[in-house]
């Protein structure tokens, strides 16, 4: 197996952060340290504060109160380039990639290491090709991104994050527009990348069963408050899920011994 640099020391810590807009609190005071080198799923109902929290981690909006630390340093103390070398963010609504091939899209990930006028060298080309191979798109590297299937397109964007060589990936609903086969494809890829490279991954996920299967840790929000956190085995209990989603839910053991499977009564 090829050896990769392991980045399992990188993580975020939240100190009593909150987020408010006029007349409404979207995220109530929250303190939390995300497990380093693991996949953490942010789960909860629509409007629970998952994407708000992820955007704060990605510096797209500052907290109204409290402090966010990245590797024990205040988030605002990082320069834009240094932050991009540590953290890569994939929004739910992907920006257009019209006229770009997979290889050209993935190459954008090298921008934080050079800037707009920096030279693209042999080491960069190696990083790009490595990322394309890691996500299984080498045969499609010359194809236009717009011509790919939904799952292939999502893998191309993830390859761009890999080429960015960041230590933490922030993914906002990376499977929301995919069928179940492509959901499995993308989430298994994300989990494998985390294991092989020690990447810290924080992902907003709606499907609790997918989250339990592919995440190492779960953080549950309801109404802007964190109401549960723990391993999938700790979260996948009927009373806990009912508290998170507000409806009666049951649990069945997985026939193959994986994470338990939830269902609605």
Curated annotation (Swiss-Prot):
Keywords: ATP-binding, Cell inner membrane, Cell membrane, Ion transport, Iron, Iron transport, Membrane, Nucleotide-binding, Translocase, Transport. GO terms for molecular function: ABC-type ferric hydroxamate transporter activity; ATP binding; ATP hydrolysis activity; ferric iron transmembrane transporter activity; siderophore uptake transmembrane transporter activity. Changing residue 173 to A: Lack of activity. It is a peripheral membrane protein. Residues 12-248 form the ABC transporter domain. Its EC number is 7.2.2.16. Gene3D superfamilies: P-loop containing nucleotide triphosphate hydrolases. Its main location: membrane. Pfam families: ABC_tran. ATP binds at residues 44-51, 168-179. It is found in: Cell inner membrane. ATPase activity is inhibited by vanadate. The complex is composed of two ATP-binding proteins (FhuC), a transmembrane protein (FhuB) and a solute-binding protein (FhuD). FhuC interacts with FhuB. Belongs to the ABC transporter superfamily. Iron (Fe3+)-hydroxamate importer (TC 3.A.1.14.7) family. Part of the ABC transporter complex FhuCDB involved in iron(3+)-hydroxamate import. Responsible for energy coupling to the transport system. This is Iron(3+)-hydroxamate import ATP-binding protein FhuC. It comes from Escherichia coli (strain K12). The lineage of its organism: Bacteria, Pseudomonadati, Pseudomonadota, Gammaproteobacteria, Enterobacterales. The gene is fhuC.
């Amino acid at each position: 197996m090829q050896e990769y640099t392991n980045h399992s020391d990188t993580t975020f810590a939240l100190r009593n952060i909150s987020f408010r807009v006029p007349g409404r609190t979207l995220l109530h005071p929250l303190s939390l340290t995300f497990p380093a080198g693991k996949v953490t799923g942010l789960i909860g109902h629509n409007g629970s504060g998952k994407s708000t929290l992820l955007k704060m981690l990605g510096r797209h909006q500052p907290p109204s109160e409290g402090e966010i630390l990245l590797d024990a340093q205040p988030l605002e103390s990082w320069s834009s380039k240094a932050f991009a070398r540590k953290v890569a963010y994939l929004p739910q609504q992907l920006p257009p990639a019209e006229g770009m091939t997979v290889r050209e899209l993935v190459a954008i990930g090298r921008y934080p290491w050079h800037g707009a006028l920096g030279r693209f060298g042999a080491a960069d080309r190696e990083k790009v090709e490595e990322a394309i191979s890691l996500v299984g798109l080498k045969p499609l590297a010359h194809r236009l991104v717009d011509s790919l299937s939904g799952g292939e397109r999502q893998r191309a964007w993830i390859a761009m994050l890999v080429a960015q060589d960041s230590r933490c990936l922030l993914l906002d609903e990376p499977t929301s527009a995919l069928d179940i086969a492509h959901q499995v494809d993308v989430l298994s890829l994300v989990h494998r990348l985390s294991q092989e490279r020690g990447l810290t991954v924080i992902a907003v996920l709606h499907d609790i069963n997918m989250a339990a299967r592919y995440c190492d840790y779960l953080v549950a929000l309801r109404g802007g408050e964190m109401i549960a956190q723990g391993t999938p085995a700790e979260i996948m209990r009927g009373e806990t899920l009912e508290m998170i989603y507000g409806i009666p839910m049951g649990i069945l053991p997985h026939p193959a011994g994986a994470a338990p499977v939830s269902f609605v009564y």
